[in-house]
Regions:
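Intrinsically disordered, low-complexity regulatory regions
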Residues: 1-116
Length: 116
C-alpha cells in the first residue's frame, strides 16, 4: 500500500505492467506516423485506422514480415532499397515501422486464437 503526503492511498504497483517504462514514445509516434501515411489505399480511399484488426491470416503477415525484414537487413548492411511500386528509396525507419506493423498484426491474430 502506498500512502501519499496528501493522505491519499493506493495499492502498490508491484507486479503490474509498467507500460510507461516498457514502451518507447518516439517509436510509437513514428509508428503512428507510418500508419497514418499508409491509411490511403491503392484506390484512393482512406481505410479505418483499425481496419487491420478485422483480421488477416498470419500467412499474409508472415510474407510481408519477411519482405520488410529483408529491407531492414539490407539497410543495416549498407545496401540501398527501393520500393518497386513507387521507385522511392526505402528508409530504415519506414522498413522498421512496416516490420513492426506485421509483427503486431501476427501477434494480434495469435492472441485472438486464445479468445475464440
Amino acid at each position: 500500500m502506498r500512502k501519499f503526503a496528501s493522505g491519499a492511498t493506493r495499492d502498490s504497483d508491484e507486479g503490474k505492467n509498467d507500460y510507461d517504462g516498457f514502451l518507447s514514445y518516439p517509436v510509437l509516434e513514428a509508428f503512428g506516423d507510418y500508419m497514418t501515411v499508409h491509411r490511403k489505399q491503392a484506390d484512393g480511399k482512406l481505410r479505418d485506422s483499425d481496419n487491420w484488426q478485422k483480421g488477416m491470416t498470419q500467412a499474409v503477415y508472415m510474407k510481408s514480415m519477411f519482405r520488410h525484414f529483408f529491407d531492414v537487413w539490407a539497410l543495416h548492411r549498407g545496401y540501398k532499397r527501393v520500393d518497386k511500386k513507387t521507385g522511392k528509396e526505402i528508409t530504415k525507419k519506414e522498413a522498421l515501422m512496416a516490420l513492426l506493423f506485421n509483427v503486431q498484426g501476427y501477434a494480434h491474430e495469435e492472441l485472438r486464437k486464445g479468445k475464440k
